[in-house]
Amino acid sequence: MFEKLSCHTSIKIGGRVKYLVLPNDVFSLERAITVLKDLPFQIMGLGTNLLVQDEDLDIAVLKTERLNQIEIKGEKVLVESGTPLKRLCLFLMEAELGGLEFAYGIPGSVGGAIYMNAGAYGGEIGEFVEAVEVLRDGEKTWLSRNEIFFGYRDSTFKREKLIITRVMMSFKKEKKETIKAKMDDYMRRRLEKQPLDLPSAGSVFKRPREDFYVGKAIESLGLKGYRIGGAQISEKHAGFIVNAGSATFDDVMKLIDFVRKKVKEKYGVELETEVEIWWNGRRW
């Protein structure tokens, strides 16, 4: 009955949950929510920007990875929320639709990316959204772009109880070779700078302001490689915390708190976490 979430998060941390449900389509997701209406639940995409407590959680988790259909409609694309971002980027390249190249190499699902308005290299996924289909109190409805707020690593979906099911996105025609060259460049930069060889939950902290680079600030404090238990500030990019071996939820949380304290002391800046935290069955 119980399923370890450490097998479903990119940082390889997480306790057991009562039920892990993998709906095959949007209808199955709706049905699962109806069945689980009296049991607390959380939605998970690919678990790539997520830190989960080690203790058992008395909840169900609905994992959307099987909701991965993509349809092309001219310069518009309808994509299900569990679709990996990498797969969407490759699909767009083949369709000669440009704009999302910056997202190539960002781990995670389309739904998770929309939820947090994921971005990199000056681009954000919210720029390409035309409408989002959601489940609100179990009812399916579409939100148009002017009904949706997107901010820096923030969106309507973080503030309201909405479950993203499908997204309509709009792109511009561009040559496949041009798109591929951009994607290859972004991937090369990621491989050079990010610790993709070790389990992590991605970038840990939000940038507090445009001119403040968190990784460089942490590095300036001499904290690259600093370790608490099995959690370590990456030696490659100080904005990442990696699981260097049997790290626990508490190890990572203590390291996050330590970094926040040191940055506050040196720079007077309060760091907010970008990574999503599940503790006591709630999102933080």
Curated annotation (Swiss-Prot):
GO cellular component: cytosol
Domain FAD-binding PCMH-type intervals: 12-174
Catalytic residues (UniProt): 153, 203 (proton donor), 274
Pathway: Cell wall biogenesis; peptidoglycan biosynthesis
Domain of life: Bacteria
Cofactor(s) recorded in Swiss-Prot or TrEMBL: FAD
Subcellular location: Cytoplasm
Catalytic activity: UDP-N-acetyl-alpha-D-muramate + NADP(+) = UDP-N-acetyl-3-O-(1-carboxyvinyl)-alpha-D-glucosamine + NADPH + H(+)
SUPFAM superfamilies assigned: FAD-binding/transporter-associated domain-like, Uridine diphospho-N-Acetylenolpyruvylglucosamine reductase, MurB, C-terminal domain
EC number annotated for this UniProt entry: 1.3.1.98
GO molecular function: FAD binding; flavin adenine dinucleotide binding; UDP-N-acetylmuramate dehydrogenase activity
GO terms under biological process: cell division; cell wall organization; peptidoglycan biosynthetic process; regulation of cell shape
Keywords: Cell cycle, Cell division, Cell shape, Cell wall biogenesis/degradation, Cytoplasm, FAD, Flavoprotein, NADP, Oxidoreductase, Peptidoglycan synthesis
Tagged with keyword Chaperone: no
Stretches of the chain forming a coiled coil according to its record: none
Keyword Transmembrane helix in record: no
Similarity field: Belongs to the MurB family.
Function of the molecule: Cell wall formation.
Name of the protein this chain belongs to: UDP-N-acetylenolpyruvoylglucosamine reductase
Species this chain originates from: Thermotoga maritima (strain ATCC 43589 / DSM 3109 / JCM 10099 / NBRC 100826 / MSB8)
